[in-house]
Amino acid sequence: MTASQLISVSPDELRFHFELEKQTFCDLKVLNNTQNHVAFKVKTTSPKKYFVRPNTGVVHPWDSCIIRVTLQAQREYPPDMQCKDKFLLQSTIVSPNTDVDDLPADTFNKESGNSIEELKLRVAYISTASPEGSSEDDASRSSHKLDSSSH
């Protein structure tokens, strides 16, 4: 992150646990790094595949918000579990009393002369599929790890 960035996002990659016929989500934390009110908008290369809530918002100075990106249930696995989808998070400074519903239509339009910062986020699918017969063993191992780490 450079000091001049209006907002920072974590994680910097959207990671979805991919299962056929199941919806899954990833939360992004958006942090306003300035003393200004900052408006944001989320765009994606695959709008039919994802729900983004909120997809537009205003973050108060030094505050943060959570954006939930939901991957819709898919009918087939992508080739090699690779995902070429991308997200773009645009941000710009707005006046202090701006409400998300009051944002002008051209807020995120560079041609209007607005100064827009853009942050690109990649998408990664994590396979939840496991070889036959090993899923129970994996589940007991991972729950065992959780038990031992919580003491």
Protein language model annotation of sequence segments:
Residues 1-27, 31-37, 53, 57-60, ...:
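Intrinsically disordered, low-complexity regulatory regions in eukaryotic proteins
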Residues 37-45:
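Short, basic/aromatic beta-hairpin or loop at an interaction surface
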